[in-house]
Amino acid sequence: MFTDWKEHTSHVKKSFGELGKQYPKMLQAYQALGAAAAEGNVLDAKTRELIALAVAVTTRCESCISAHAEEAVKAGASEAEVAAALATAIALNAGAAYTYSLRALEAYSVQKA
């Protein structure tokens, strides 16, 4: 497993800041996108972070996992809620693999014909 998630999260935030110094408009746009997604308060912070954590798993983004795990804790998510969100991500990834397997079989059949 990863050595130190808190250290990793700190490193990610520092790295974002460093890149943001070189490309401030890009960082501002990225931050604005996050703010726009939260606009309207339809989803509370905890729900948004549970979704973000599940998406981070499906996109295999370790930095996203680190940052959104921290935010999920801050938003008051329980371990059971995090586990349920992750179980949903696992099920969705399995579904994607299943449907892409059907496409692979179709491609094989077409290539064989």
Swiss-Prot record:
InterPro entries: AhpD-like, AhpD_core, CMD-like
GO MF annotation: an example: oxidoreductase activity
Database matches in Gene3D superfamilies: AhpD-like
Top-level taxon of origin: Bacteria
NCBIfam families: ahpD_dom
Protein name as annotated: Uncharacterized protein HI_1053
Organism of derivation: Haemophilus influenzae (strain ATCC 51907 / DSM 11121 / KW20 / Rd)
